[in-house]
């Protein structure tokens, strides 16, 4: 049956990267060859970082960091260090492994078929089931999440991301016992160094017991980021922030359903298994070769190496 609001949806949603609807804010026609050359040379000079020569990937990182070369370098450093030191999120990234398969069975992650007028892409996630699983499921959830956005960064150029997290099917025990300050701190640190600008986060269908988690979350992020976090009891409220063409049909938008977007992402993650196991998405920093910061005597609590790991400002 055709939805009543289909007449208001004037963009046909397609999931191919080349078909994404973009605007003048899009950077697709800009090669940024000089900046990419500088990044390749810089990576070659960094003893602890992998020697990346994938120009399209580096270009997407540069665009994601607002065309700032030094910001991109800082981001790449943190990006690869996180992957080396936070094993629960970035250990063996096998799409057919038990941990990732469990996450795929329980959760959908999808990427909007269209971009906003500003060139932002919407990431939507929803749990399929609230079943209990052995171990720390949120670590598996986070591993799968970063595999999905790594895959998307490899294929698509965007100016930033907006996240919609549908909490309609949430495991109360997981949320209240596994979302610890340490888990949030590591998650936020990883997101800080990811080569995407975080525009907004929308939590919808939020259960009342989740308030304690959001209080912890907000206490760990700068006020600037707090202003980008929204909680909605009514899912349709996201339509006040994001245009319909970028919102799944089951949330009142014109894009494909969360299930369709999630299944597409899942299929692609499995299809790119070699890239996750042995290709660019498996690469990490060699922390034994990381230069020490001679200007600092501080010890990083997160990364565990001498010297103060420079923290990015999220903007």
What would you call each of these model-derived segments?
Residues 1-315:
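Basic, amphipathic alpha-helical/coil surface patches used to engage anionic, phosphate-bearing ligands
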């Amino acid at each position: 049956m055709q939805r009543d609001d289909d007449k208001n949806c004037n963009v046909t949603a397609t999931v191919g990267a080349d078909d994404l609807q973009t605007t003048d804010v899009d950077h697709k026609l800009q090669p940024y060859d000089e900046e990419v050359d500088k990044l390749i040379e810089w990576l070659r000079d960094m003893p602890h970082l992998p020697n990346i020569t994938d120009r399209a990937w580096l270009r997407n990182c540069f665009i994601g960091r607002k065309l700032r070369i030094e910001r991109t370098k800082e981001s790449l450093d943190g990006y690869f260090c996180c992957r080396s030191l936070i094993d629960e999120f970035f250990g063996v990234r096998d799409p057919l492994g038990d941990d990732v398969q469990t996450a795929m069975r329980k959760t959908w992650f999808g990427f909007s078929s269209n971009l906003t007028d500003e060139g932002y892409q919407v990431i939507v996630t929803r749990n399929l089931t609230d079943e209990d699983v052995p171990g720390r499921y949120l670590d598996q959830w986070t591993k799968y999440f970063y595999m999905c956005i790594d895959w998307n960064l490899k294929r698509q150029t965007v100016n930033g991301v907006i996240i919609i997290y549908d909490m309609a099917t949430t495991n109360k025990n997981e949320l209240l016992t596994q979302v610890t300050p340490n888990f949030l701190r590591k998650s936020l640190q990883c997101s800080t160094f990811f080569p995407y600008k975080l525009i907004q986060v929308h939590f919808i269908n939020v259960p009342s017991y989740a308030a304690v988690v959001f209080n912890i979350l907000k206490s760990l992020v700068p006020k600037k980021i707090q202003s980008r976090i929204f909680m909605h009891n009514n899912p349709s409220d996201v339509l006040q922030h994001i245009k319909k063409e970028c919102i799944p049909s089951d949330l009142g938008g014109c894009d494909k359903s969360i299930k369709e977007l999630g299944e597409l992402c899942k299929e692609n993650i499995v299809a790119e298994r070699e890239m996750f196991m042995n290709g660019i998405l498996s690469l990490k920093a060699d922390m034994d070769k990381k230069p020490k910061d001679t200007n600092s005597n501080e010890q990083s609590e997160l990364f565990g190496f001498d010297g103060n790991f420079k923290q990015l400002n999220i903007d």
